Amino acid sequence: MLTIVAIALFGALGCLARYLLAGWVYAFVGRGFPYGTLTVNVVGAFLIGLIMEFSLRTTLIPQELRIGLTIGFLGGLTTFSTFSYETFRLLEDGEFITAAVNVLASVLVCLACTWLGIMTARHL
């Protein structure tokens, strides 16, 4: 039961964090490219690498907290569905290069940030 509560509470916090962070990014750089979605996904990629690697190397993060942080918070923070929708809209609008850049940037930068999170955790 504690795990379910952790997922729900951290999930709510992750959703709020996504809304606030993406909104701040869009307010700062505009909406010509899906920077807000890219930002939350990149942050989430780094954090999942950090949290998972750290939890594999130590017992400092209880299982309920790890699940709450990864499935709950990061599940609420990151968004593959919004990434998919925004990319589809770019394609529909004929913005083929922008759509391709979005896909490549999302995949490559997120993978790099996951690796960076893992490397960071290994040096803690």
UniProtKB/Swiss-Prot annotation:
Na(+) is not transported, but it plays an essential structural role and its presence is essential for fluoride channel function. InterPro entries: FluC. It is found in: Cell inner membrane. GO terms for cellular component: plasma membrane. GO terms for molecular function: fluoride channel activity; metal ion binding. The chain crosses the membrane at residues 4-24, 32-52, 67-87, 96-116. It catalyses: fluoride(in) = fluoride(out). One of its GO terms (biological process) is cellular detoxification of fluoride. Pfam families: CRCB. It is a multi-pass membrane protein. NCBIfam families: crcB (TIGR00494). Belongs to the fluoride channel Fluc/FEX (TC 1.A.43) family. HAMAP family: FluC. PANTHER family: FLUORIDE EXPORT PROTEIN 1-RELATED (PTHR28259:SF1). Fluoride-specific ion channel. Important for reducing fluoride concentration in the cell, thus reducing its toxicity. This is Fluoride-specific ion channel FluC. It comes from Geobacter metallireducens (strain ATCC 53774 / DSM 7210 / GS-15). The gene is fluC.
